[in-house]
Amino acid sequence: MSKEERPGREEILECQVMWEPDSKKNTQMDRFRAAVGAACGLALENYDDLYRWSVESYSDFWAEFWKFSGIVFSRAYDEVVDTSKGIADVPEWFKGSRLNYAENLLRHKENDRVALYVAREGKEEIVKVTFEELRQEVALFAAAMRKMGVKKGDRVVGYLPNSEHAVEAMLAAASIGAIWSSTSPDFGVNGVLDRFSQIQPKLIFSVEAVVYNGKEHSHMEKLQQVVKGLPDLKKVVVIPYVSSREKIDLSKIPNSVFLDDFLATGTSEQAPQLEFEQLPFSHPLFIMFSSGTTGAPKCMVHSAGGTLIQHLKEHLLHGNMTSSDILLCYTTAGWMMWNWMVSILATGAAMVLYDGSPLVPTPNVLWDLVDRIGITVLVTGAKWLSVLEEKAMKPVETHSLQMLHTILSTGSPLKAQSYEYVYRCIKSSILLGSISGGTDIISCFMGHNFSLPVYKGEIQARNLGMAVEAWNEEGKAVWGESGELVCTKPIPCQPTHFWNDENGSKYRKAYFSKFPGIWAHGDYCRINPKTGGIIMLGRSDGTLNPNGVRFGSSEIYNIVESFEEVEDSLCVPQYNKFREERVILFLKMASGHAFQPDLVKRIRDAIRVGLSARHVPSLILETKGIPYTLNGKKVEVAVKQIIAGKAVEQGGAFSNPETLDLYRDIPELQGF
């Protein structure tokens, strides 16, 4: 095999080792490497050798992993993939095979093993759901869905917290071949309808209220408005989550029913049996949503087979997960990490579903769960680790964390000082893995790896089968320098298509407009030629991503436009030296109106209600002008560069270039 050519500067900042793999431990990655070597007649001495082979011979790699993973199927594949096609051709994977995603997640026959631990803010009790109980519940959900006419290809959606109901409804939909989408209760009406109205769901599951940050938040008024905006709904299933059903009024929601009554429609004298529709590998499983930077969020369709095999690769090989593991991923059902998390059931591992604030009643709430349940893997946001450090929390002194062997960080880049904090104040022997990918691939391009050291400030490595490079503007791979994160070869987890994108133009524009035929992900990164590690440098487009909550500026504009006092607005991110992001909203006032604190408060409140508290900008400032391109587009990226102190090449691209000067040296933006 040829080594990758790595021209460019080799001098990289100090590479401090924070953790090293146990050479005596025979991981699943080790076993897979040995199996590949034996099957293919290769001398693969280490992870680097295995990685290079996996991207150079990607068809063979995925075929070997199919065998290794033990995927359950009813018909074998005829062809792994047509290697004459590139990633922009979106080739079909494992053609001819038949399988079911839900069947693979529910295949483990140790009936008494716990599959789900359900924990909620303000509740002492932890509910345990065994694999057998989970199968029975999924069968009930699926039978009721079939009874109301849900069939293959129909859309079933959840407006739900991170609960057992979301998992059960999703698996039931998948067992039938229906397509699942979900958003979390912190989404406002506009945010939900911007997404769900595009996919015309037949069935929606929701709750009547949630508890967060010590407060109860009623959900019924929002649900009523959402249902009004989804005319294709045949049924609205309401789950009593905070209150008993006697205290919930469904009279204002047409076609609504309580969960128990819905499930009863699918039962007869005998309990329903699980049935798994056998579907093509490429059959749609999830519709995920982009941030909506340039309008309505894009609807990314992810296949059942592609999602399954990619998640199995990450959990089995990169995470070394087994049936003895228990994973807690702090997420909502509106983030791709929820889908990623649920797939661990296919390994036989259990997961903890926590719904609530990670800081209430104390900042130790997740650590308390780690000790109480015996959690082995904790997945959280980089921001949460920073908050713990700011609060001088030292779990190493207050908790045993005996079973915990892995902490994964995602959502935003994990800063170098957080590595030091984790190993000093949490646990010195764990693997701390920063992982990075996105909703677009419903998984990771790079991440944790039990075969490699952890270096301070770096993601350990590019993941198997992911031909990732950093490219400069000329389309050349660069090493040790910042570049656009690209993927050069087909992957089974890329979307099969976008919903409502018949000619594929939105799909091509989203990923292949920067470098023809090459997937450009919209992130800047730097690959260390010495360690193979990756440093993420932030978004390369106008998407907003504060604390891992990714959304588009147009979602903010849609709210602000309703205020008659505002003529125009511009929403951009600002980064500090740690690559933490905050959102700045600039308002250009309409004639005869003044910029007032009361207006700022009303806009903040409207964004919180219409979208979520996480969408509210950190600062709202007045501006006298907003730059536009000649073809009438707001110029967000240039303003982002200016407030970061970078030079902007004006050229002839702007219709009003003089407005750019308004964004230089703004006092309120200094010192972040």
UniProtKB/Swiss-Prot annotation:
CDD domains: AACS
SUPFAM superfamilies xref list: Acetyl-CoA synthetase-like
Signal peptide positions (record): none
Subcellular compartments: Cytoplasm, Cytosol
InterPro entries membership: Acac_CoA_synth, ACAS_N, AMP-bd_C_sf, AMP-binding_CS, AMP-dep_synth/lig_dom, ANL_N_sf
One GO MF term attached to the UniProt entry: acetoacetate-CoA ligase activity
GO CC terms: cytosol
Keyword Transmembrane: no
GO biological process: fatty acid metabolic process; positive regulation of insulin secretion
Entry EC number(s): 6.2.1.16
Keyword field: ATP-binding, Cytoplasm, Fatty acid metabolism, Ligase, Lipid metabolism, Nucleotide-binding
Gene3D superfamilies per record: 3.30.300.30, N-terminal domain of ligase-like
Catalytic activity line of the entry: acetoacetate + ATP + CoA = acetoacetyl-CoA + AMP + diphosphate
Protein task: Converts acetoacetate to acetoacetyl-CoA in the cytosol. Ketone body-utilizing enzyme, responsible for the synthesis of cholesterol and fatty acids.
Similarity annotation: Belongs to the ATP-dependent AMP-binding enzyme family.
Protein name in UniProt: Acetoacetyl-CoA synthetase
Lineage, highest ranks first: Eukaryota, Metazoa, Chordata, Craniata, Vertebrata
Gene: AACS
